[in-house]
């Protein structure tokens, strides 16, 4: 992220920054970038309020259009950060798609209640299936927009009631982008 900020401060063109970000070899799960037409998709492990703020700051610096976000909150963890993360998302994104993350043994509906209780915004919805949330986020993109997919990063599974279900945000996004490209051809 620091390299992106430096490029912005040096007045490097947004197009070159996006190309450079896509070519960076960052740790898995941290600012993994996918290019989709004129859009940028960023997959990041950001799962705290501070981490979300940092990812949004970068996204706004490199985005000519709108920023959208897909995120969820982990179960059996700090409940107080859930509403904070929802507020950050709603204040920094054109539209927010809330979904599940790793509910572990906690009831996912209770997690959604914690995420939305007292939330005074109308730019969000809950999509209960994470894959559907990601594909919906991609479908919302117009020219020069950015989609943030936050919370899971490099993780290869979702933990639900002790079961580890194979799932990877980057893989899901790539597969859907390829489906779209194939349907156009």
Regions found by a protein language model. Give the residues of each.
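ATP-dependent carboxylate-amine ligase
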Residues: 2-185
């Amino acid at each position: 992220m620091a390299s992106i900020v430096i490029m912005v401060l040096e007045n490097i063109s947004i197009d070159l920054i996006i190309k450079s970000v896509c070519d960076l070899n960052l740790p898995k799960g941290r600012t993994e970038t996918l290019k989709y037409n004129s859009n940028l998709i960023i997959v990041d492990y950001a799962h705290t309020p501070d981490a979300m703020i940092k990812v949004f700051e970068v996204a706004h610096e490199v985005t000519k259009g709108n920023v959208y976000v897909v995120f969820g909150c982990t179960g059996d963890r700090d409940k107080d950060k859930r509403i904070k993360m929802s507020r950050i998302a709603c204040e920094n994104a054109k539209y927010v798609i809330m979904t599940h993350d790793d509910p572990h043994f906690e009831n996912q509906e209770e997690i959604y209640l914690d995420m939305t209780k007292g939330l005074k915004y109308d730019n969000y919805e809950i999509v209960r299936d994470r894959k559907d949330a990601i594909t919906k986020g991609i479908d919302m993109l117009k020219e020069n927009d950015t989609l943030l997919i936050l919370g899971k990063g490099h993780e290869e599974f979702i933990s639900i009631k002790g079961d580890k279900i194979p799932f990877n945000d980057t893989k899901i996004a790539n597969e859907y982008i390829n489906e779209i490209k194939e349907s156009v051809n």
